[in-house]
A protein has these predicted regions:
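Alpha-helical interaction segments
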Residues: 75, 89-90, 152-153
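Short helix/strand-capping turn motifs
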Residues: 84-147
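Arginine residue identity/basic-tract feature
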Residues: 52, 67, 101-103, 113, ...
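Charge-rich, low-complexity N-terminal segments
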Residues: 3-5, 15-84
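C-terminal partner/receptor-binding element of secreted or periplasmic proteins
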Residues: 140-175
Length: 175
C-alpha cells in the first residue's frame, strides 16, 4: 500500500511539473525600439540591432542584401544564429514582434514572422511564414518553417510548445 501511495505522489508531482502552463511574452523587433549596433548604407545597406528579450536573453536582428535574420543571444552572451537565409533565398523581412513561448520564467521557444517576397518580378507579392526555434540546453535552432494557413498562429504555438523534441532543420554556425 505504501508503494502505491508513493507511486501516486510521484506521478502527481511529475504531472504538475510537465503541466505548467506555457505562456507568451512579446519582444518588439522594430529598429526604433531596439538598440542599433551597426548600420551602413554601403552596397545595399546592412543593419544589426539588439532587442531586449526575456530571462536574460536578447535578440539580434540582422539585415544584409535585403534579407533579415535573427540571432538569439543567451544569458551568458553566446550567440545562436537562426540563419533565416537558409530557409529561403528570396528577399525577406522579419515581423515587428517576436513571440517567446515561456514555461514559467524560462523561454522554451521563439516564434518570428518572416515576410518573404517569392516573386522577384513582383515585389508586392509576399507571403508571411512563421519560423519556430527551440531553446534548450542542448540546442537553440530553427525547427519549423510554417507556410501561411488559417490556423497559422495556433499551429506555430503548438509546434513551439513541442519543439524541444524536434530536430534542427540545419546546423547553424556561431558568429
Amino acid at each position: 500500500m505504501k508503494t502505491l501511495a508513493l507511486v501516486v505522489v510521484l506521478l502527481a508531482a511529475s504531472f504538475s511539473i510537465h503541466a505548467q502552463a506555457v505562456t507568451s511574452v512579446y519582444t518588439p523587433l522594430d529598429d526604433k525600439k531596439c538598440k542599433t549596433l551597426e548600420s551602413t548604407d554601403e552596397e545595399g545597406g546592412s543593419y544589426k540591432g539588439e532587442c531586449r528579450g526575456v530571462g536574460g536573453y536578447k535578440l539580434h536582428v540582422i539585415e544584409g542584401d535585403l534579407r533579415q535574420t535573427v540571432t538569439i543571444v543567451d544569458p551568458k552572451g553566446k550567440e545562436h544564429p537562426l540563419e533565416f537565409w537558409n530557409l529561403t533565398g528570396a528577399f525577406n523581412a522579419v515581423g515587428e514582434t517576436a513571440e517567446w513561448r515561456m514555461r514559467g520564467k524560462k523561454p522554451i521557444a521563439l516564434i518570428v514572422r518572416l515576410t518573404v517576397n517569392e516573386r522577384v518580378d513582383d515585389p508586392a507579392y509576399v507571403k508571411g511564414y512563421l519560423v519556430v526555434a527551440k531553446i534548450t540546453p542542448e540546442a537553440t535552432c530553427v525547427t519549423e518553417f510554417l507556410a501561411p494557413t488559417r490556423s497559422h498562429n495556433y499551429e506555430a504555438r503548438k509546434a513551439a510548445d513541442k519543439s524541444a523534441t524536434r530536430p534542427c532543420r540545419f546546423e547553424s554556425t556561431p558568429d
